[in-house]
Amino acid sequence: MKTNQNSVNSLNKILFVNFSKFALGLTLCIGLTLTSCKKDNDLPTPDGAALTEFFETNREESLQTFTLNATTGGVITGSEGTKVVFQPNAIGLNGNPVTGNVTIQLIELYDRSGMLSLNMPTYGSKPNGDHEVLKSGGEFFLNAIQGSNQLELLIPAEIQSRGVNPADFENFQVFRAGDDIKATDLWEEADEDGDGETDDAQARDGQGTAGGFVMYNAFDTSAFGWTNLDRWYNYTGATTQLYVDVPAGYDGDNCSVYLTYDGEPTALARMDIYDEDTELFTEHYGRIPVGQAVHFILVAEIDGVLHYTIQAATIVNGHTEIMAEPQPTTQSQLETLIDALP
């Protein structure tokens, strides 16, 4: 049987065109798949465990240690000027005074860069459950050990904040936030004497290290752990709920978001709620003043390198801050940037 050559050529042409379309389509599909995978692989992989370790390591490295005779008591002075006064036989174990030398441990924080590096923001819980930012006059961790034994205070110790110029002095109340160095509790008003009232620090005056006249706050603590000189921010006027939208790949498990208030160098709030449905950070009760000038700070650790974003903003009603992609930095560089904020 004789085959029509034109028909064969036409069929081959159709088959070639169809195969070419198929091959092109397959190539496009593979290309899109590879591109999608590449984009997924390009997403940052913040390490939440490494960030937690970063904070905890900073706390351990910030510990100052002093040797004190527990029988006679005495005074220790931190590198930032904090003083702690111990009465004789004030330190004990299982309710009994210890004798001989003990090791006193102290952390003192007076600026928001240190507060952020140790993840100790000035964010408190009111008796009614509301959460609100605090203005701090100093955060302190105090502890005592003897060998491997954790000790206790049998008689309250007095903590004295560093001295400041009388024109800069403010009265503060006393807050507590957990006994352990790793504590992440919110600050709560202290009531050491049990009278139902928040303890007020006492205003004192004296001679500073440079010889000038200074004022400082002093208060008693009956337990080791974290204490803070604070007052509630107590702003007036309209407030709003605040939201922070972090870049893809970041969430409540692998990064931290903080808020500084312009003009308040010792106030540092943390956005402590992450909504997995909306993928937004927020805080509890909408206590952010409308019109407040602030700076948002996003911190994460990626492949062993600290990353950050700092953004200035003025709060508007229903504010949502969209954070830019964090950039690599060092701890010292980040602290310098934070200390330079208004």
Language-model features, listed with the residues they occupy:
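Proteolytic cleavage junctions
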Residues: D40-G81, N89-V102, I107-L116, G124-P342
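Sec-dependent N-terminal signal peptides
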Residues: N12-T27
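Bacterial Sec-dependent N-terminal signal peptides
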Residues: K2-L11, T27-E61
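Intrinsic-disorder/low-complexity regions
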Residues: T3-L11, V17, T184, A190, ...
